[in-house]
Amino acid sequence: MSPLFSIITVTYNAEKVLERTLRSVAEQSYARIEYIVIDGASTDGTMEMVTSYKSQSPGLVRFEVISEPDKGLYDAMNKGLRVATGDYVWFLNAGDTLQSPETVARLAEVAERNGMPDI
């Protein structure tokens, strides 16, 4: 079976930069992606944007959103790791993007071809 990729994005008041990140995940051609957004209780429009993308992303295996105060970046990252179920975990920062719609598919192909190594 093809590997499941958990992509985790940690946010806090990232409304101005987050859309391109969400779009790059939603546009992936690879079907076995769970996307986890950990938000530190943003006060801008971050959560509205995330909620909108969640409803527009039926192709993802799972789209998990947690929005609550945290104790900083590493606490938020650890929250994401605790809920991730993928064979591979990828942190994609708010404002960053996946290079192309084929990025995860290419990684999955290499992983499968090489016996699912740690990468």
Question: For each predicted feature, which ranges?
Answer:
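Nucleotide-sugar donor-binding/catalytic module of glycosyltransferases
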Residues: 1-119
